[in-house]
């Protein structure tokens, strides 16, 4: 008799066990009607929350948009409140400087979820423009200071140009009287930074700062909060030089206030593009910018203070016989001269502060920036 193959018997036993296991699995998986039951799945709640902007001027609005999955109800918390639809959009107001947090909380059968969006509110905005200087692109910065409670109106613009060695942010933080005027809603302040902390008036740098100024105007021109028909410029020392240069080479400024610097001889030779009003201030003991003209700081050849004002007046068709008066600015006596009767209701003023050097500090009884702003307003056509 042939020998029985034990391996064959073993295989048969294994197959029987496997078939029994499969049958048991199928039986346990069947529903009452004989069909296969669904295997339970965990559908977790999902929120997609987005915003139209990541930063916004305070009191202005942004749009929030959201969609959800696997949720039954939603509500808002943080800097917005109330029940929310499962998908939708909402305009929300930015009410404070810094982070404004908008949180959406949703509940579903398989749990809860919360998603937040932070929107930065600001009154100071730092912006960058690229400019070609010496064949290479350079970042040029400027700061915009808005009122604390901006309205929907368009605001006049006042540019403030720092002196040599300064920057826009420093100038913004230096004059509390300017901030007060801005927060009262009189105007929006723009504080540019000079390339290498200087303005190119007499070849101080390779930058074209008139072009930089025009680039700023172009950059902000689409925003209706800026009234580009009322643009003014204030400059201190080296900043006065660029204010005079912009005033001569463009027609954007409606008024300028060059402080402790008059026109250079080269700028004086330029025929102005437009007509504007001038509020010029000099100290009679200025050792950097000589009041009587000549070579001064950075080997710059200045006109005299009176000659600079007369140059403006002559170009603007003013009466060339100025009115004279004596004023008191704090502890300082001031000789004031006014050329009136200029084209388009403009006026040219210059002030010589006695016993004063290269400074605009004349004591606490006088606020120069309030005087300048009142002068600008008085010349509006």
Roles of regions detected by a PLM:
Residues 42-51:
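Proline-enriched interdomain boundary motifs that mark the N-terminal boundary
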Residues 35-40, 88, 118-157, 205, ...:
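A domain-start/cap signature at the N-terminus of enzymes
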Residues 84-101:
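Solvent-exposed segments in extracellular or luminal domains encompassing
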Residues 28-29:
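C-terminal motif of bacterial Sec signal peptides marking the signal peptidase cleavage site
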Residues 159-163, 260, 282-283, 354:
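The conserved beta1-alpha1 loop
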Residues 133-146, 152-232, 241-245, 362-366:
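Serine-hydrolase catalytic machinery in alpha/beta-hydrolase-like enzymes
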Residues 277-281, 303, 313-381:
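C-terminal catalytic histidine-bearing segment of alpha/beta-hydrolase fold enzymes
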């Amino acid at each position: 008799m042939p020998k029985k193959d034990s391996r064959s018997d073993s295989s048969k036993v294994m197959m029987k066990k496997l078939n029994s296991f499969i049958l048991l699995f199928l039986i346990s998986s069947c529903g009452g009607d004989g069909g296969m039951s669904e295997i339970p799945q965990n559908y977790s709640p999902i929120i997609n929350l987005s915003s139209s902007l990541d930063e916004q001027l305070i009191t202005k609005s942004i749009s929030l948009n959201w969609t959800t999955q696997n949720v039954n109800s939603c509500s808002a918390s943080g800097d917005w409140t109330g029940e929310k639809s499962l998908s939708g959009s909402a305009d929300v107001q930015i009410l404070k400087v810094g982070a404004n947090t908008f949180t959406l909380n949703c509940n579903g059968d398989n749990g809860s979820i919360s998603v937040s969006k932070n929107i930065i509110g600001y009154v100071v905005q730092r912006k960058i423009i690229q400019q070609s200087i010496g064949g290479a692109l350079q970042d040029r910065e400027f700061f915009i200071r808005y009122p604390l409670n901006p309205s929907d109106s368009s605001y006049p613009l006042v540019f403030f140009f720092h002196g040599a060695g300064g920057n826009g942010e420093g100038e913004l933080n230096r004059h509390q009287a300017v901030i007060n005027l801005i927060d009262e809603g009189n105007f929006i302040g723009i504080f540019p930074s000079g390339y290498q902390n200087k303005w190119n008036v007499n070849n101080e740098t390779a930058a074209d700062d008139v072009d930089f100024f025009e680039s700023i105007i172009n950059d902000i021109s689409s925003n209706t909060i800026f009234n580009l028909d009322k643009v003014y410029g204030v400059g201190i020392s080296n900043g006065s030089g660029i204010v005079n240069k912009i005033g001569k080479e463009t027609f954007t400024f409606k008024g300028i206030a060059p402080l402790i610097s008059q026109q250079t001889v080269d700028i004086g030779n330029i025929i102005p593009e437009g007509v504007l009003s001038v509020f010029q201030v000099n100290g009679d003991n200025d050792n950097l910018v000589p009041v009587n003209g000549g070579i001064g700081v950075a080997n710059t050849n200045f006109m005299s203070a009176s000659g600079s004002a007369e140059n403006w007046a002559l170009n603007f068709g003013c009466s060339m016989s100025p009115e004279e008066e004596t004023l008191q600015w704090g502890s300082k006596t001031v000789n004031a001269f006014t050329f009136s009767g200029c084209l388009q209701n403009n006026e040219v003023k210059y002030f010589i502060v006695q016993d004063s050097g290269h400074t605009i500090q004349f004591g606490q009884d006088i606020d120069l920036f309030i005087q300048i702003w009142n002068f600008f307003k008085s010349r509006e056509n």
